[in-house]
């Protein structure tokens, strides 16, 4: 895991989040050309692959959120999503096939990743964490 030095303004991100359509646990900020469905990139990668597309095809920004879109551009991201983790919940233990960027927006000292069987805390809001 790489912990980036720069920090992002979580207040600005939260303000832009308010402009998005209603969503529950995740919303995709990018899709493939011609698709405006903000749920298409959510869930399992298999859904994307079964449609004949690749994860890397999801580069077209769906929303006018300039600050977040500038982060997408800076890192050349695709299939970017916001996730909402409810209290006392967690992701299933898994390994992504591609590099991931995580920027906690609201977090606490109990949040962590498990990387190579080691607990890594992610207490800093706005701090980017690159997982490969």
PLM feature spans:
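A short beta-strand-loop-beta hairpin characteristic of the jelly-roll/cupin
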Residues: 104-125
